[in-house]
């Protein structure tokens, strides 16, 4: 019951639910605000939920001390967003100036879809660069020269810090453990990159413009991203809210893309009759895009997880079925939602898995590698029933990846 009230309040905070029971205080009698605050921190939704609190009558709002803490954290989130918007545009322009096409993945590009972008807790700058691994290594060295450092190189990106901002330069936006699905995923990425690097959006606070993924690409890619994190560590409601906006933006993005294509073909709709015809054809266009997206999800092995995520979006954020890109899968969805509630942001708060987390001593020496790998196997076994292809492939991929890292370090 408590979670149901939380879900409704999140919808109220996002502006998608009227919330009369919150405005008149009837749902908040004896409400445990401290517990809700802890929930908001665990799920990295402090700024989002503050949007709802700011609309409440004073009589039903949190006590002054808690309210001030909440407000100060929200203001800090807002300041970080302002800084990161400017930093994102700065890094994007530097990469473009170096001669590479690129686009911003997730992050501030996702924030731009929010009603109040400043309420979303920001992360780092993820950039997909259309270049070879060797070129991206050189690019990372160039960016790190300005008050920065190279942090690490992984299979799909190089992480660096420049002017205090964490940046990931991606060779590819991601990978899958199943080799067949991974091959298809990489092919899909290669076929998609040009369109993503041409799709310009304006970041909030008049920070400037950057390239960001199209709506139809995001519907598949960000679902893959959630699936990947679900297997390797976990996902939280912050990531779910991001994907909620991706789905809401899907239909609008499809129509905008269609109109841009028609403009490029000099097919401007000048007469009222033309506009009427365009309106009639909008629904089939959206349906065709959904079918194309569903085909991609099936081909990439994401169909079952898509159904689970649609269930979570419906239960937590009230997503209507007509907006969904796949039918709800209740069994997988209930398991996913339970893991989200237990684990919080990227699974970092899941006490069920505390035994497997990496630990470090004062010198930064890792003691938890064994526990980390056992935890991976434990997660694979838990998910085997519902996602067998990835669960069975993950241990094999991990061995291959260990060899890949060893080989990279020899270079």
What do these predicted ranges mean?
Residues 249-295:
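Arg/Gly-rich low-complexity intrinsically disordered repeat tracts
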Residues 1-123, 129-251, 292-411:
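Conserved NTP-donor binding/palm subdomain of two-metal-ion nucleotidyltransferases/polymerases, i.e.
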């Amino acid at each position: 019951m408590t979670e149901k009230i939380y879900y409704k309040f999140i919808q109220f905070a996002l502006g998608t639910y009227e919330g009369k029971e919150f405005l008149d205080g009837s749902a908040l009698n004896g409400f445990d605000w401290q517990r809700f605050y802890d929930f908001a921190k665990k799920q990295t939704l402090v700024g989002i939920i503050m949007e709802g609190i700011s609309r409440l009558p004073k009589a039903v709002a949190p006590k002054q001390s808690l309210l001030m803490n909440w407000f100060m954290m929200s203001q800090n989130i807002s300041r970080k967003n302002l800084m990161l918007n400017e930093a994102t545009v700065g890094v994007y322009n530097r990469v473009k100036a170096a001669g590479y096409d690129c686009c911003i993945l997730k992050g501030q590009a996702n924030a731009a879809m929010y009603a109040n972008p400043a309420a979303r807790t920001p992360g780092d700058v993820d950039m997909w660069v259309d270049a070879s691994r060797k070129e991206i290594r050189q690019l990372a060295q160039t960016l790190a020269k300005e008050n920065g450092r190279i942090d690490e190189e992984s299979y799909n990106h190089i992480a660096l810090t420049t002017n205090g901002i964490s940046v990931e330069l991606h060779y590819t936006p991601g990978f899958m453990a199943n080799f067949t699905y991974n091959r298809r995923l990489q092919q899909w990425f290669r076929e998609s990159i040009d369109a993503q690097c041409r799709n310009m959006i304006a970041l909030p606070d008049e920070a400037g413009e950057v390239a960001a993924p199209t709506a139809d690409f995001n519907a598949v890619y960000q679902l893959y991203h959630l699936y990947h994190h679900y297997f390797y560590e976990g996902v939280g409601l912050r990531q779910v809210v991001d994907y909620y906006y991706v789905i809401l933006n899907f239909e609008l993005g499809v129509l905008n893309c269609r109109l841009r294509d028609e403009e490029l073909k000099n097919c401007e709709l000048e007469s009222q009759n033309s506009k009427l015809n365009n309106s009639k054809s909008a629904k089939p266009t959206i349906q065709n895009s959904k079918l194309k997206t569903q085909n991609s999800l099936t081909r990439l092995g994401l169909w079952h997880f898509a159904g689970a995520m649609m269930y979570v979006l419906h239960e937590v954020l009230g997503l209507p079925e007509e907006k969904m890109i796949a039918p709800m899968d209740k069994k997988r969805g209930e398991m996913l939602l339970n893991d989200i509630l237990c684990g919080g942001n990227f699974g970092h708060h899941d006490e069920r898995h505390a035994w497997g987390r990496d630990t470090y001593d004062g010198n930064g020496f890792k003691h938890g590698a064994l526990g980390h790998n056992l935890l991976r196997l434990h997660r694979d076994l838990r998910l085997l029933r519902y996602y067998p292809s990835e669960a069975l492939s993950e241990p094999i991929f991990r061995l291959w990846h260990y060899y890949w890292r060893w080989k990279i370090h020899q270079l």
